[in-house]
């Protein structure tokens, strides 16, 4: 049976890159999002590529809607990304819990009900499951963190949901924890600053990144590749892995932008992020694009759209 993919949250940064990756592999792709703003898809895909994508407007808090999409498109693989990020989950905690926790539970339940057809499930957890006090935990991908944001609590709960579906129902999955993802389409969330700075530099505008921590930076197409590979992996259990990247201070990020856009007016606030600087990786093989190359490619795409 040929592959047919459902990607929830596909209109976001990582989701758009996943859709592009799959389309370029000549795979059938259906997106499932509550909104209809496909600007991130249009930013990174050619019109002919986008015509091959089926866009479905739906809400992950509806088990019926999810089941309908899975059946209508005979889905064989699922990547679940749909979520309210830190600022939105903080602004409306009940809605954040509904989307992030109940929505994810619905994904697992819908896939369980169709396990004879659906061969792979990957979902997004987050480095937000950790706190700065979790430096030791961050050295072990299977360690339990102590999140200090509602979003992080939601993601930690989802990792538990995945384990329970494995233990009680034998439903396999792989969770991946992104940290600082950058690249075209990354324009929302607490850590979008580096990409917003690249876009500002191309426009000739000044920009101040709102934090300064030494952090691990992952290029969005690398994260996309990791999710696709995870959904295809013939795994057993419910493992969770940290997505790798290049760990550098913010000064190196700014320098990489300035190298591509001489005269760029980029600075950053001396504010740390509430997460460890880097994390254990290696449990699941994933690509890592050097930061300088990722910034170069991102700036080039922004320049091509000016």
Residue ranges and their predicted role:
Residues 130-131, 149, 174-192:
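Flexible, glycine-rich beta-alpha linker
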Residues 1-77:
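N-terminal Rossmann/SDR dinucleotide-binding element
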Residues 87-103, 139-147:
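Short alpha-helical oligomerization interface
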Residues 205, 209-306:
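C-terminal substrate-binding subdomain of Rossmann-fold SDR/epimerase-dehydratase oxidoreductases
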Residues 105-150:
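Conserved Rossmann-fold NAD(P)-dependent oxidoreductase catalytic core, especially the SDR/UDP-sugar
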Residues 132-135, 146-174:
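Active-site Tyr-X1-5-Lys
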Residues 156, 169, 182-195, 220-221, ...:
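Glycine/proline-rich active-site loop of Rossmann-fold NAD(P)-dependent oxidoreductases
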Residues 89-90, 173-184, 196-218, 222:
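A conserved pocket-lining segment of Rossmann-fold NAD(P)-dependent short-chain dehydrogenase/reductase
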